[in-house]
Every structure is written in C-alpha cells, then in structure tokens.
Amino acid sequence: MVVVEGLAGLHRSHGCGELTAADAGKEVTLMGWVHRRRDHGGLIFIDLRDRSGLVQVVCDPKSGPAFQKAEEVRNEYVVAVRGLVRRRPEGTVNPKLPTGEIEVVAEEFRLLNRAKTPPFYIDDGIDVDEALRLRYRYLDLRRPEMQRLLYLRYRTTRAIRDFLDARGFWEIETPMLTRSTPEGARDFLVPSRLRPGEFFALPQSPQLFKQILMVAGVERYFQIVRCFRDEDLRADRQPEFTQLDMEMSFVQREDILKLVEELMAYVFRETLGVELALPLPRLTYREAMDRYGSDKPDIRFGMEIVDVSDLVAGCGFKVFAEAVARGGVVRGLCAPGCAGYSRRELDELTRQAAVFGAKGLAWMAVTPEGIRSPIAKFFTSGELEGLVARLAGKPGDLLLFVADTETTAATALGALRLEMGRRLHLYDPEQLAFTWVTEFPLLEYSAEEKRYVAVHHPFTMPMEEDWPLLDSDPLRVRALAYDLVLNGVELGGGSIRIHRRDIQEKMFNLLGFTPEAARDKFGFLLDAFEYGTPPHGGIAFGLDRMLMLMARRDTIRDCIPFPKTQSGTCLMTAAPSGVSPEQLQELHLRSTARKSTNPA
C-alpha cells in the first residue's frame, strides 16, 4: 500500500485548468483530486481536478515509483504531480476540455491523502438526490458547476464593492445581536445569560441601524450582511440569507433608482458579460396589478389582463352583471391557440384560479364559426364581438374571465397568466427582463389583526401629495417605495424613509401602537430624529435570490454554500440540535417540548 506523504518541498506552480498548448515543454507541479483514473495498455491516465478545471496526467511504467503510486489511487484521492507538459498525440485531442490539447507526463507522484468511495460521483452530469447532496455538501461543492456558482457569488460581491467604493459608499457592520421589534416575520431569539428572562434578536435587516447611520452623518452606507427570519420556507427563501443593504442621505427617489440601475448594469456586465439597456422600465403598483395581476410582474411576455366591466355591466349573464353592480370587476385574458382545451384542462385552470380566491372561471373559445362557450347564450352578438375585440382574440384563442373583487380578479388572473406563459412557452428563459414597481400603497388593512399594517415597513415615507389622506383615508396613501423585479421575482425593495418625528409618530399611531408602545420599541429612533435627521432613503437586495436568477437556477439553495433544507435543518451538521440541561440552566431556561428526532 502506498504511504500517504507530505509536500516535502513541492510547490504548486499552476492550476490544473490553467495549462494550454503554450505551456508545452514546461515542467509543472500540480495538486488536486483524482477525478477519474483509467488504465490503458500499460499507461495510466488520471484526470486531475482542482477548482480551475481538469487536466490529463499520464503515468508511464518507465517513471518507476510515480507509476506504482498511480496504480493505487482511486477517485477523490488527493495527489501532487510534478511533470512535463506535452501536446497530446494526434487523434487524442479532446475539444470538449479547455486543456484538451495537452497532457502532463508524470515524473514525480505523491499521495497526499486517501478518500473513501464517495456516495455519488463528483460530476455535473449525475442526477443526485438533493438531500444526499446537502448531507455531503463538502463533496457536492467540489462539482464544477457548484464551483462556478461559488465563484459567481464572489465575483458579484466584489463587483458590488468596487462599484459602491468608487461612488463614496462606506461599508459598515451593524450589530448581529439587537432587540426584537414587531411588524416583521418571527425573530430568532438569543437568550441573555447575564440578564435572565431577556432576549436578543438576530436582525431581520439592518433597517434601523442604517437609518441611525444617516443621522450620524455617514451619508452613504452599504453592507453585505447576514439577515435572519423565522418563517415558513419556500424554494427562494432561507432562515438565514445574505442581503446587499444600502442607504443614502440627501437623496430623492430618482437618485436611488438611477444609482441602482447603474449598479445592476455594472454587476451584470462584470460577472455575466451582459449589457443592460438603461433606464429600466417602470410600472406603478396600480399598473402592475391591473395589467399583470402581480406586484412582481414578469414582463418577458404579453398576455396582459384586460378590464371588461363596462362591456358586461348590462349583459344577460348574471354572474358578470351582478359582480359589477356590487362594485366588483370582470377581467379577462387571451390565451393564444388554446381554443381546443379539453374539459379536463379547463377544470384544472378553474381549480388554479380558485386557489387565489376566485369563485369561478368563465371561458370562451374563439373559433372561425364564432364563440363556443356554455355562457355565450347570455350575450348578444354585439357584446361577444366587443369582448373578443377588447381582448384581441383571434380564431383558435381561448378567453378566460374572472368576476370578483378587484384584488381577487387581479391575483387569480395573474396566476393563470404565469401558468399559461409557462405552458405555452411564451418567453425566452434566457431573457433578463427588469422592471421597477413604484407607488405602492403605504398601508393595507388586516382583517385578522383588525388594524392597518405597513405594506413595506413602518419607516416608509408617504408621498408628499398624499399626506393629507393620512387623517382622512389612509388606505389611499401611496408610499415613496419601490421594488426592482427581474423575470417576475422581487430582487429588492426600498423606499425614501421618514425622517421627521411627527410623521413617524403618526405612522406608529396608524399602525395601532400606543405612544408608550412606540416609545418602548422605537424610542432610540424617535430620539435620534430630534437631532437633525437628513432626508434619506435606500434599498436592500436579496443576494442569494439575485444569484439564483443570474445563474438560472430553480432554488437559492444551489447559490448558498451551506443552505438549510425547506424544513429549516442543516443535513450536514444536523442543526438545530438539543443542548445539555447545564446549558439551559445557565440561561435560566427550561425545555417544555417533547423530545423529537431531528429529520436531519
């Protein structure tokens, strides 16, 4: 058995994937993992891998000890090779490999470490269960595609720092241990050993601290920061995630949008070689909901939602007419080429609309002979022609309608629009379609909590022309808030902040805080506002989500080095885990939960 050796004076000269035909004739020293070993006609070929790529190493029996050691290595053994670069013989060039024109003839071979047989082959073309990948994440991250994603993450954060540094931003850390505040997701709590019964909270965002930095005169701040939210998980969410956080003083909304557009253009150019056309499109919240049924519109394709309430207000179809009479709406969209949908397919669409609260889904198939629909008999020929014209329907198209409240009709049709867009391949999956959404409502009413809640957060400045409505009609107040959306996914959101104590106190009052409760939770911020707070605003981006879209991945778990599962566990470390009674006692805590087995 070959003995594991040390480096003993060997110094790596090149990365495996860095060698080219121009290096032929050079002596090199390479180190990495055995990706694949092949024994052909007395020669041993080893594909040696490191993070830069692969290169073929040839071991000849004439090399003596080097050949003997190469005979014993297996996949994922760690080795060092010193040898001569030569061009591959004619007919053996591998055009699929960047180093495919050359190979390294081993003169010295050292085994640096052995490896057990991996639970899966370290290669991109292998379909491996995600749970197994996460359990052996240190092996999964060796795969070239995962290495590429790690490098993309590094390149992206470096580009962000370079861009913001050149524009006078300071990178400043804010506390990880802070106090729990309301109006967000559940906090992760950290008990204080020195103050029994009291808790820190891990930050959901640095929102209050970055505003305090503006009070402190920093003027331009950014941070690539960890944030924590104890919420139900989805494919694009994690309990801990990384955020690009920015804040600026003495700015208006246009200043922030312009700078962010330039930042996005720089990052996408530097990392992906993609040029973005500026300025980016903009939609108000109202326009986005009316046309796309979502405040995160995917504008890669049309199929926009159309209001037909005026056309059906007096029609003979009671479902439509009564919805309009109650103050609701009737809206529709045109699905091209879907007139032949079967009853089963139409029922499936109806079920999908019901998930978003729609009480039903009406349909009309446009055919060369006219309209085919169970509800066509309730309309005059003029009304049918008007509906087809309004929705720009053509023979072969399917018209879908929802009659309900404005919100339900918009969200149900918005969901159907996305579903039909996917089914009909109406967009290029490689396209990058950015849009800003602006003028969000400041507040919405929570029937469950029986109070107003902030659509973004309690520190968002109302649009100045809407200030009088704070007293008379709060739900009509628009916020100086903005989201950046890419391909129907929210990349980030921000706002101009409240910088006056009187407006902030009015906002807290609208949200149901008593003066005492506001003082208890946010007294430090209110006090700071008494000492000359500049107008300021900012934005925050989910870095993991942005990388997911840049890399065209389906889940952010691929873009985070050590992610949690959808149940919030780490399969590699088996976290979260129980702790000893002694640890709990030190923190003056006692567990009342039944002992459970961690699925990790």
Curated annotation (Swiss-Prot):
The residues that hold ATP are 229-231, 238, 490, 542-545
Which catalytic reaction applies to this protein?
Answer: tRNA(Asx) + L-aspartate + ATP = L-aspartyl-tRNA(Asx) + AMP + diphosphate
Any idea of its EC number? 6.1.1.23
Q: What does this protein do?
A: Aspartyl-tRNA synthetase with relaxed tRNA specificity since it is able to aspartylate not only its cognate tRNA(Asp) but also tRNA(Asn). Reaction proceeds in two steps: L-aspartate is first activated by ATP to form Asp-AMP and then transferred to the acceptor end of tRNA(Asp/Asn).
> Which GO cellular component term is one of those annotated?
cytoplasm
What residue range is the signal peptide?
A: none
Cite the record's note on assembly.
Homodimer.
Please give the PROSITE patterns that the UniProt record associates with this protein.
Answer: AA_TRNA_LIGASE_II
What CDD domains does this protein map onto?
AspRS_core (cd00777), EcAspRS_like_N (cd04317)
Q: Where is it located?
A: Cytoplasm
* Name of this protein: Aspartate--tRNA(Asp/Asn) ligase
Q: What is its main location?
A: cytoplasm
Detail which positions bind L-aspartate: 183, 229, 456, 497
Q: Mind listing the GO molecular function terms for this protein?
A: aspartate-tRNA ligase activity; aspartate-tRNA(Asn) ligase activity; ATP binding; catalytic activity, acting on a protein; nucleic acid binding; transferase activity
**Residues marked Important for tRNA non-discrimination (site):** 40, 91
Q: Which gene encodes it?
A: aspS
Region Aspartate: start-end pairs:
207-210
NCBIfam families assigned to the protein according to its UniProt record, in alphabetical order: aspS_bact, PRK00476.1
Instruction: Please cite one Gene Ontology biological process associated with this protein.
Output: aspartyl-tRNA aminoacylation
Q: Which HAMAP family match?
A: Asp_tRNA_synth_type1
Q: Which family does it belong to?
A: Belongs to the class-II aminoacyl-tRNA synthetase family. Type 1 subfamily.
